[in-house]
């Protein structure tokens, strides 16, 4: 799932086609009706009305476009979902909705979610485990509670102390 919900969707494709594209690549043997059924199910799972099936990305809000990206990423039932700053381009109320949605689909699809972010308050509130990177290298890895309560590396300590966090630990 990408950071820019608009930029990650082909503006010439309908929402249904965007979501079904991975099926065209990895499950070519499916009939059109089967693909449509899978797309509509994925849309429902992310809170999108099937009335959006034949619409285009420019007709949707940023939050709806991000839900399209999430539906597209779920269409082939992955075991791992990589989210690259998936809420940073969204306003706060939509951020909360998308984060709640990710939590729901994590359980429903039995997913491991790799959540890439610089926003420590979000990391603190949704992640079970945190890996801190500096210049592409891992400087610390721990469960979220321990990492925020007792960071070991100097870099992690500086990182945590540089950003006030209003969200308490889980």
Please give the residue ranges for each predicted region:
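A short, proline-enriched helix->beta-strand linker immediately N-terminal to the Walker B motif
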Residues: 75-79
